[in-house]
Amino acid sequence: MNAPSTMTDKKPEVEHLQGENPPKDTYSAEDTATAILRKKRKPNSLVVDDATNDDNSVITLSSNTMETLQLFRGDTVVVKGKRRKDTVLIVLTDEEMEDGVARINRVVRNNLRVRLGDIVTINPCPDIKYAERISVLPLADTVEGLTGSLFDVYLKPYFVEAYRPIRKGDLFVVRGSMRQVEFKVVDVAPDEFGIVSQDTIIHWEGEPINREDEESSLAEVGYDDIGGCRRQMAQIRELVELPLRHPQLFKSIGIKPPRGILMYGPPGTGKTLMARAVANETGAFFFLINGPEIMSKMAGESESNLRKAFEEAEKNSPAIIFIDEIDSIAPKREKTNGEVERRVVSQLLTLMDGMKARSNVVVMAATNRPNSIDPALRRFGRFDREVDVGIPDPTGRLEILRIHTKNMKLADDVDLEQIAAETHGYVGSDLASLCSEAAMQQIREKMDMIDLDEDEIDAEVLDSLGVTMDNFRFALGSSNPSALRETVVEVPNVRWEDIGGLEEVKRELRETVQMPVMYAEKFLRFGVTPSKGVLFFGPPGTGKTLLAKAIANECSANFISVKGPELLSMWFGESESNVRDIFDKARAAAPCVVFLDELDSIAKARGASAGDSGGGDRVVNQLLTEMDGVNSKKNVFVIGATNRPDQIDPALMRPGRLDQLIYVPLPDEEARFSILQTQLRHTPVAEDVDLRAVAKATHGFSGADLEFVVQRAVKLAIKDSIEEDIKRENETGEAPADDVVMDEDASVSQVQRHHVEEAMKMARRSVSDAEVRRYEAYAHQLLTSRGLTGFQFDSADSNTNGPSFGNDGADDLYA
């Protein structure tokens, strides 16, 4: 019972619950949605700290805390931890402790499923009785090779020397004769907990318990094992925990509690994990139905299996029935050919309707294809609520990483926030795989110190293991989001410095793609959605594809490269479906850059091709609708590249779709010099090679043409170097290896002038002057047809209007 004085210590927000109406602005919509997650801090909620003594029956508090809780030294209390676990302990006091803290040892913490820093709740337990009979069994690995009586050496001294309350299911450790033995309380009579007295009968004989069996229950999933879906967890707890634990809430307000919840979302986001956590934390009976398992070839058996599952759950209420992969047993009836599936769907409908209103059974189902489920199941009264368990944001990913690394030994340089920021599109299972791969990489690095033939690995080696940031970097390089496994998704390794010239184009790209990803809050503050599309056009070989790769790398976005023709299919409707799939995957892995290369092959002006069945037009229509539907909340950028801009459907190039039209011209002399430097930055070049002269002589060459010149020159240098080595080897006979190293300078080790001159003889332009003129005319036409170049606001002292667009108003159709 709490002291009366503490009632005034409650926070104002808790008091609102007792008043008539809380102030309207107390909670935001987000707060209301996650209200169930807010723990109301009570005086008897204490923070766990490590015990200074190692007694399994003791909890130590400060004298102020004991006074607040009206407890005395030696009182017996019930301590509640996580996952509905509790135990009974004796209270001791320590003057030096701070208030609001409870000290318990490791064994008690394991029994309560809590860690240091977690919260436990303490309540007095004045009516605890003496136990008549208890049954304890040792854990097998702690009694191996032990001789003598367990009772005389361990149990008798443990219980005779002290006043010990115990609870059924708890573990306790006893020290004696140079070793410690761990026991489990298998049974306590007459109650679940009691105090062991002189008259208590102790049964201790029996088969020792395997630690694996014990630890499987320790590894049960709880709410603290789930990260990245705070809002969804709140929804599920509202709909499941409240009806199961407090059905009277619904009764008193006069509504029926929810019957079912459908969770949907990509694979690996934690749908099944959530259902298990809710079952463990509510203490409900958990009945798992894997979709395909209940199907049977015998007539009527599939429906019978379903009926049995529901009957079993009602007998063991409160219960949760969890149907995994529900789309396999409840597909749309009009689309299934099999009679069995139809009957199973009908049976599921009648069972969910037939559940008694307050039978304390909740049905949960999970799928990653919600639209293939029969619509009759998705109405109120069956699956009342649908919870979208989506891909986590950076904060969610950080939560998940912390959960997966809480038992890992991490080096000091590991920055989990940085990893969370870089893992766009990763779901919980991907992050678990990432942590596991990083740990494996650390083990691989230490392989030379590990002797696999030895039974025991040296303790020093085990202590030296620690996962570093480099291990995580390696794991990041070798993994990608599971949503994009079937699409070739890569964060390319092209950087801005790999692209020579094009400074103006790079600046525009940074503004369009990099800024919305890196400064999203600025766009929110100004109340605009950033543009989502860019079209590069220009002659072949000017670096359009390279630019798209570089921008995806610079803002750490995922990159999906789609070659135009590979979207087209001979089957009716397949091409549009391919376009849809690409955009769905991009939205799932946002921020993502979708790069449509050779856009003119799939987005030709509609109506131009009279011969086909309209397949090309349908693809264009699908592209248009997808680009309008690139959700403003998702950072999906579409970059198109073409060297035939006049053939692309004009509807694609309006503002709101591919609104940034960027002309990538042939490089000028300065840009050509920059490209040559970029191409040769890792190549040894003789000092007398004048790249300026090469840049001057290659007027009209594209970046690809210059790359050909460089490759040709390097190839000639390598050829000369090999010939020089062979010649020298023939002259000196079998020269020893160190002589070869000494004479290295004598061989051709650089690209020299004559190599470049020879390469220039083979050089050729890939773009003719006529083509360049055509591109420039098109770019000029776009520039002049689009801009109100003369517009200015009226100045304060002037009454004249600014220059109008076109001629005076007489010719204006809308005047």
From Swiss-Prot:
Q: Quaternary structure per UniProt?
A: Component of the ribosome quality control complex (RQC), composed of the E3 ubiquitin ligase rkr1/ltn1, rqc1 and mtr1/rqc2, as well as cdc48 and its ubiquitin-binding cofactors. RQC forms a stable complex with 60S ribosomal subunits. Interacts with ubx2 and ubx3. Interacts with lub1. Interacts with rbd2 (via C-terminal SHP box); the interaction is required for rbd2-mediated cleavage of sre1 and sre2.
Q: Which GO terms describe its cellular component?
A: Cdc48p-Npl4p-Vms1p AAA ATPase complex; chromatin; cytoplasm; cytoplasmic side of mitochondrial outer membrane; cytosol; Hrd1p ubiquitin ligase complex; mitotic spindle midzone; nucleus
Q: Name one GO molecular function term.
A: ATP hydrolysis activity
Q: Which domain of life is it from?
A: Eukaryota
Top-level EC class, please?
A: hydrolase
Query: Belongs to which family?
Result: Belongs to the AAA ATPase family.
InterPro entries in alphabetical order: AAA+_ATPase (IPR003593), AAA_ATPase_CDC48 (IPR005938), AAA_ATPase_domain (IPR050168), AAA_lid_3 (IPR041569), Asp_de-COase-like_dom_sf (IPR009010), ATPase_AAA_core (IPR003959), ATPase_AAA_CS (IPR003960), Cdc48_dom2 (IPR004201)
Cysteines paired by S-S bonds: none
Q: What is its EC number?
A: 3.6.4.6
Catalytic reaction equation(s): ATP + H2O = ADP + phosphate + H(+)
Control of this protein's activity is summarized as: The first ATP-binding region has low ATPase activity. The second ATP-binding region is responsible for ATPase activity. ATP binding to the first ATP-binding region induces intrinsic activity of the second ATP-binding region. While ATP binding to the first ATP-binding region appears to prevent ATP hydrolysis by the second ATP-binding region, ADP-binding to first region promotes the coordinate and cooperative ATPase cycle of the second ATP-binding region.
| Protein's name in the database | Cell division cycle protein 48
Instruction: Please name the GO terms of the biological process aspect recorded for this protein, alphabetically.
Output: autophagosome maturation; inner nuclear membrane-associated protein degradation pathway; mitotic spindle disassembly; positive regulation of cellular response to hypoxia; proteasome-mediated ubiquitin-dependent protein catabolic process; retrograde protein transport, ER to cytosol; ribosome-associated ubiquitin-dependent protein catabolic process; SREBP signaling pathway
Report the protein's function: ATP-dependent chaperone which probably uses the energy provided by ATP hydrolysis to generate mechanical force to unfold substrate proteins, disassemble protein complexes, and disaggregate protein aggregates. By recruiting and promoting the degradation of ubiquitinated proteins, plays a role in the ubiquitin fusion degradation (UFD) pathway. Has a role in the endoplasmic reticulum-associated degradation (ERAD) pathway which mediates the cytoplasmic elimination of misfolded proteins exported from the ER. Involved in spindle disassembly.
UniProt keywords, alphabetically: ATP-binding, Cell cycle, Chaperone, Cytoplasm, Hydrolase, Nucleotide-binding, Nucleus, Protein transport, Repeat, Transport
Q: What gene is this protein a product of?
A: cdc48
Q: Where is this region: Disordered?
A: 1-30, 794-815
Query: What does the entry list as the binding residues for ATP 2?
Result: G541, T542, G543, K544, T545, L546
Its annotated compartments are: Cytoplasm; Nucleus
Residues where ATP 1 binds: P267, G268, T269, G270, K271, T272, L273, N368, H404
Biased composition of type Polar residues is found at 795-804
Q: Which PANTHER family match?
A: AAA-FAMILY ATPASE, NUCLEAR VALOSIN-CONTAINING PROTEIN-LIKE
Which Pfam families does this chain map to?
A: AAA, AAA_lid_3, CDC48_2, CDC48_N
Q: Where is the composition biased (Basic and acidic residues)?
A: 8-18
